[in-house]
Every structure is written in structure tokens, then in C-alpha cells.
Amino acid sequence: MQIISVINQKGGVGKTTTVINLAAGLSQIDKKILVIDLDPQGNATTGLGLSNMDNSSDTIYGVLNGTREISDVIKKTQFENLDIITSNVDLSGLEVETADDSNRAFILKTKLAAYLNDSRSLYDYVLIDCPPSLSLLTVMALVSSNSLLVPLQTEFFALEGLTQLIKTI
């Protein structure tokens, strides 16, 4: 099972586009894919044809704030073999809401591991679309993943950003 976070603190580098296209491509070769939209902008959600206006508890936000289980919020997409856990703007408040939780960086890892252990054969890949920052959400994705994919533009500032990301990791 590969859990891949597509990460870069810079916006507009193709993280969401990479997640959507990689997920769609892998699903076409009969791999079972779960996309987790961890970006409050919810572009992976809308890019895969779902609404990012859902009730917050029916999204990854509900999982991370403890009101829902992963199995409750997985949604089918129009693509066979491709499911998603959607996101919306309410996710941006999670950092403040969990400020007193010393284990908050591990919430996603714990919940995802429990779900995948119960459903090991359901998915071949989990792809996590990260927000354009080195925030709590990005740290949650980092500790939950066993692989990272870092899209870069071919410019100096992108390389500077990669250096910052490597230091964070």
C-alpha cells in the first residue's frame, strides 16, 4: 500500500493537477485509489466532479475533528476504482481547534492506519493533496505518508522552496 503525499508549500505548482491525473491514470489500469483532499480550497474535490460545499462533517474535516470515521466520509467519483474524501474551507480552522492537542500532527496517521488495517485490500494507493503551506495539515500528511511527490517549476525560487521543505521533513 502506497500512501503518497503530493506536497509543496508553494501554490500553483501542480499539486492538485498531479493528484487528479495520477489518480485517474492509476484507476484506468485497475488500481484502486483513495484521494484525500487535505487542502481547504477543495480543488481536488471539485476537480474530481464533487462539491466542496458539503456539510463539514461529511469531509476530511469531520474525520480530523473526531466527529466522523473515514469509512463514513468516503465518496465515489465518476471514475471506476477512484474514491475521494472531500474537503472544504472549514478545514482551515482545524489548526486553531486542535491547538491544545499535543498529538494533533498524528490524528490523520492514526485514523488512516486504523481504517486501512481494517480494509487493507480496498485500495492500492492513497494520494493526499496537500495545501500550499507548511501548516499542520501538511505535517499531518507528511507523517501519514510512506512516499512524497514534490512537483516543481523550473525556476530558482522553486528550488529555494524545496530546500525549506527538505528541512521541514
Q: Where on the chain are the PLM-derived regions?
A:
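P-loop NTP-binding core
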Residues: 1-169
